[in-house]
Amino acid sequence: MAQSLTRVHFQVFLILLLCFAAAGYAGYLAMHDLQLSSYQHRASQTARAASDRITELLTQQRQRLEKIAGQPGVLGVLQRGVPAERERKEDEIKSMLPGAVAVRLLPRNGPGTMPSTETLDRACLDFIRRVSMANTPVAPEFHAIGAATEHYDIAVAVRDENRKPAGYLLASFARAPLQSAIELALPPGGYMELQQAMADDQWQTVIALGQVASAGTASVVSTPSDSRWTLMFQSGEVPSAILSGNRIFYFAFILLAL
């Protein structure tokens, strides 16, 4: 009889032990997931803030270009077609655009065609041709990536009295203002990478800031509005040691503790 009671007590003890262990492990999982969810939420907010800064900068630059392109003097320069006059106007416009490294006024000969005398590189020429054939604004693009002449281009139409494109105002900007906008949103220990979609469905990194975080950190992707760019952000926040690592180890530790 005494042995039977002892066996029952031992079985009850084991059941209680397993219940406590299961409850402890469930609590661990809940805390771990809650912490990861918190990190992911903060990372998403940070990436969105950086994307918003990029969008704000691009919007301001495009609006300045559209305002300048709407001036009668700009249309007159394009219509007269005097190279020296056009170069002076380009220099004047460049001085009005913070961060601009070059400005071109490009007359339009016909649908999708540009004068052969224009000394544009192949990427910029392709960009302008797509601008000339589009009914909506074309997203800015980085060109000469990795070279000393690296820049991103924004182009707007210069319209005549009938609101038809007479040419295009092309502005090339240094990456510095864009990089500064990203740096303002980058927290300590974080890593941000701005990537541009290429023609072959590949992505190319155009700006990388911070240090690549270790595995296990929150990583999110955000897309600035009206762009071909994607922003990738790694927060650098790592779960505390007690909430990371081998879960079997913690399960065994709980059993021993109980």
Regions found by a protein language model. Give the residues of each.
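Alpha-helical transmembrane segments and their helix-membrane boundary motifs
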Residues: S4-L17, S244-L256
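Extracellular/periplasmic juxtamembrane segments that couple receptor/chemosensory ectodomains to their
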Residues: M198-L258
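Extracytoplasmic/periplasmic ligand-binding sensor regions of membrane-associated signaling proteins
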Residues: L97-A171
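Sensory-domain boundary capping and coupling elements
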Residues: L169-S172, F233-S235
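Amphipathic alpha-helical regulatory segments at dimerization interfaces
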Residues: R53, K67, E87-L97, R130-V131, ...
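Juxtamembrane extracytoplasmic/periplasmic/luminal helical "stalk" adjacent to the first N-terminal
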Residues: H9-V12, L16-R80
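Non-catalytic regulatory/interaction regions at protein termini and inter-domain linkers
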Residues: M1-T6, F10, L18, L34, ...
